């Protein structure tokens, strides 16, 4: 990695998880068009997120990251964006109050279209076709035409991301994020929840605090009516990402302006690979998914490449172990990081290591396993004397039935009722809020 970096230096290295486009000239034309379009985000915003990440790394804030497994063209609507944003706000206010610290809010939104796959092809009833890699690449329909990778989908992804970002900015700054309104939504959730008795005391304390602030004349403060919200996605399709690399006029640094934060998946984190090469050169805050196959030596080498200056706001290690593997694998990684004095933000992805197949054939996740991994993540960090800095979840504001369990339990038999995901199962609004209240209890104990 001592070679000079450029936005296209990744093209000379081995690359994983890429579609096979049949028309290279068409792809090159689309890449050129994308590069001529305005950026989706600005360097100053990415710098601000990096500053906030540093606060998390140093134990002064907490990271909440959530959103769709994969955004889709078919389910694109203002209502769906609003509902997911709303639930993230609800989760954040509970965590903020319990932890007594700021919660950095990052959505898997406005760009989370591409998905890595375990195989290049898919076979059903003896018919083999290219795997569905997300709407940015090909269609989900199991027919030859749908599954051909189409460069025009890159353009559609850009336009949908633009509209999504526009709406998110309006929601964040236009009064929708008012703390009083968000708290009212939480009161409605608790009133209709089986957990009412357990969490009503926390809601009452938030109510009292807001009433006190109102009595002091602080209810019109911008801090109560507006919020900061950032976007992120997996940097998987590097031809798309390269098109949004811009040089900041203030610092002369390169930024990938397709999102505020980008991350590398567990399948594409090879030290000699294209994805690591690309992300080492952009100045955004970045993440790496860390699974049970990661060993301490490789992790340290990866950190050295991606965060050579040991900046506390640069690198988020996203642990995705599985509930039954956290205790066996996470401690040795934390110890290696501490031993080498590396400054990283640790967060937990309790989703990807806990995917199972129900007897009905649906892919699902058990809420008890999700919660179990989160609890163990906190316990391991407490035992090691380190800071559990965040949570990274796949969720939606919609009332879907994709993950089993929760206070309003979804059973395996009920999965088919509203199973809408284009890829992996997501927690619904109730399950997400239940998780937030449970994490809030843990944060309160940790930060005493």
Model regions and ranges:
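Glycine-rich, charged/polar anion/phosphate-binding loops
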Residues: 48-50, 272-275, 302, 330-333
